[in-house]
UniProtKB/Swiss-Prot annotation:
It catalyses: Fe-coproporphyrin III + 2 H2O2 + 2 H(+) = heme b + 2 CO2 + 4 H2O; Fe-coproporphyrin III + H2O2 + H(+) = harderoheme III + CO2 + 2 H2O; harderoheme III + H2O2 + H(+) = heme b + CO2 + 2 H2O. Fe-coproporphyrin III acts both as a substrate and a redox cofactor. Belongs to the ChdC family. Type 1 subfamily. This is Coproheme decarboxylase. Keywords: Heme, Heme biosynthesis, Iron, Metal-binding, Oxidoreductase.
Length: 250
């Protein structure tokens, strides 16, 4: 049996994707529609207060294409807090006009593939804590996709030795480092939580960097032989004070 990688786990993560039911929303009188939007704004401003206390974070993006219109990403210390947020969100009047198109449940994760030997408690390391319990950037663009490590008769990631996996992940990581300062990456583990094994969330002020890094990594052995991917979602930052314009119907 191959040695399993150990992980450090941080905040729990919930990506929620919605399409707006514009046809139904168009039938709502403007004053009622304005009230729906105001209630939605207040809800998100209230859930965002965790950032100041460093007990979670969140991001809101307008997704490009027909897979979704909105992405709400929540990070919290406990899974049940994500349940509470989702339940309260579903009670909002605006939820009657938002159609769920996708969701992803996971937890911020760091593996030990590239970690050196140390007697230090990693959870007390400031650099590691900042990655496990992050303050999300307000970058212009976001890209999210789920992924698996392939396991079949020809290529099975889980049958490789720890040393083989460490070498592959080192080479893989070297590509990622080339994009430092251009892309901020968050890996969330989802084995036992969702249909894929990991979620990858990328932030950048230059949307083209997503294409560049994903394409370059296609030639990396870790991805070429062992990577399997779900759908990609790309979107632009939207602030709650822009909701009036976003939901406006002339």
């Amino acid at each position: 049996m191959s040695q399993a990688a150990e992980t450090l786990d941080g905040w729990y993560s919930l990506h929620l994707f919605y399409a707006v039911d514009w046809a139904s929303l168009r039938l709502v009188p403007k004053d009622e529609r304005d009230a729906l939007v105001t209630e939605f704004q207040s809800f998100l401003e209230n859930t965002a207060t965790v950032r100041s206390s460093k007990s979670g974070d969140q991001a809101i993006y307008n997704i490009t294409g027909q897979k979704a219109d909105l992405l709400l990403w929540f990070l919290r210390p406990e899974m049940k807090s994500l349940n509470h947020i989702e339940n309260e969100f579903n009670k909002l009047r605006i939820a009657d006009f938002l159609i769920p198109t996708y969701s992803y449940v996971s937890v911020i994760e760091l593996s030990n593939y590239l970690a050196g030997k140390s007697d230090e408690d990693p959870y007390e390391n400031p650099h590691i804590k900042a990655r496990l319990y992050p303050e999300l950037p307000h970058s212009d663009y976001i890209c999210f996709y789920p992924m698996n490590k392939r396991r079949n008769e020809t290529y099975n990631w889980y049958m490789l030795t720890m040393e083989e996996r460490q070498k592959l992940m080192y080479d893989h990581g070297m590509i990622g480092r080339k994009y430092a300062g251009k892309i901020k990456q968050f890996i969330t583990g989802s084995v036992g939580f969702d249909d894929f094994e990991w979620g990858v969330t990328l932030f950048s002020d230059d949307v083209l960097q997503f294409k560049k890094i994903v394409y370059e990594m296609r030639f990396d052995e870790t991805t070429a032989r062992y990577g399997e991917f779900g759908s990609f979602f790309v979107g632009h930052l939207i602030n709650t004070n822009e909701f009036d314009q976003f939901f406006a119907i002339s």
